[in-house]
C-alpha cells in the first residue's frame, strides 16, 4: 500500500497519481486538526471535516480506481481521558476498568460523528474499531485481519480507522492506537 497525502496533492495541484489497478490512498486526519484538542469538552471541527469530505469526494471523482482508507487521531475525544486517568501508567484494575471503557466509548462517539459527516457528503464510510483489526506483539502493532479490510475496500466502502485503546501484555495492560 502506498501512502499519499490528499491535501498536499490537492494544494499543489498535481494532476495524477501513479497509475495502479488497485491503488490505495491512506489519509490520516490528525486529531488536532479535526477536533478542538485543547477544549475541555470533546468537539469535532465540523466545518473542517465537511471541507475534508468535499475534497475527498472530488479526489475520488478524479481518481475513481483509487481506494481510500481513512485514519483519524484521538484529539479531544481521547487524549484528555488517557492523561486524566493515567491509563498508560498503571494496570487496569477496579475503577480503572471503567476509565478505560469510558475512553473507548468516547472514541466510538468521535467515529460516529465523523461517519455522519462523511455519509451526509455522500461518501460510503464504514467505521471500524482499530483494536478489532490490529494486534500487538512485542510492542509493535500489526494488521491481523487483512482479508476483512480488503473485502470492505473491494466492496467499495471507505474504511475509517481511528484512535483507539487496545489491551496488551505490558505493565499497564493497555496502549493507545493512534498512528
Predicted regions and their residues:
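Conserved mixed alpha/beta catalytic, RNA-binding, or beta-rich assembly cores of soluble enzyme
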Residues: 158-160, 167, 174-179
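N-terminal active-site beta-alpha-beta segment that forms phosphate/nucleotide-binding
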Residues: 45-87, 92-104
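Ligand-binding beta-strand-loop-alpha-helix segment within the catalytic cores
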Residues: 84-165
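Short acidic, glycine/serine/threonine-rich loops at helix termini
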Residues: 37-39, 79-84, 137-140, 171-173
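Short, active-site-adjacent cap segments at secondary-structure transitions
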Residues: 33-35, 75-80, 133-136, 166-168
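Short beta-strand segments
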Residues: 26-30, 71-72, 128-129, 160-162
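N-terminal glycine-/serine-/threonine-rich phosphate-binding loop
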Residues: 2-69
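Charged helix-capping and loop-helix junction motifs
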Residues: 43-47, 141-147, 174-179
Amino acid at each position: 500500500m502506498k501512502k499519499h497525502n490528499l491535501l498536499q496533492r490537492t494544494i499543489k495541484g498535481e494532476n495524477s497519481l501513479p497509475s495502479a489497478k488497485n491503488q490505495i490512498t491512506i489519509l490520516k486526519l490528525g486529531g488536532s486538526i479535526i477536533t478542538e484538542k485543547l477544549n475541555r469538552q470533546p468537539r469535532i471541527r465540523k466545518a473542517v471535516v465537511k471541507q475534508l469530505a468535499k475534497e475527498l469526494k472530488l479526489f475520488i471523482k478524479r481518481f475513481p480506481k483509487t481506494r481510500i482508507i481513512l485514519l483519524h487521531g484521538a484529539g479531544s475525544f481521547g487524549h484528555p481521558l488517557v492523561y486524566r486517568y493515567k491509563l498508560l501508567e498503571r494496570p487496569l484494575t477496579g475503577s480503572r476498568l471503567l476509565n478505560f471503557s469510558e475512553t473507548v466509548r468516547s472514541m466510538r462517539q468521535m467515529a460516529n460523528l465523523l461517519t455522519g459527516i462523511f455519509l451526509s457528503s455522500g461518501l460510503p464510510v464504514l467505521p471500524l474499531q482499530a483494536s478489532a483489526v490490529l494486534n500487538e506483539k512485542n510492542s509493535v502493532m500489526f494488521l491481523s485481519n487483512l482479508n476483512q479490510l480488503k473485502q470492505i475496500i473491494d466492496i467499495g466502502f471507505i474504511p475509517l480507522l481511528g484512535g483507539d485503546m487496545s489491551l496488551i501484555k505490558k505493565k499497564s495492560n493497555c496502549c493507545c492506537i493512534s498512528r
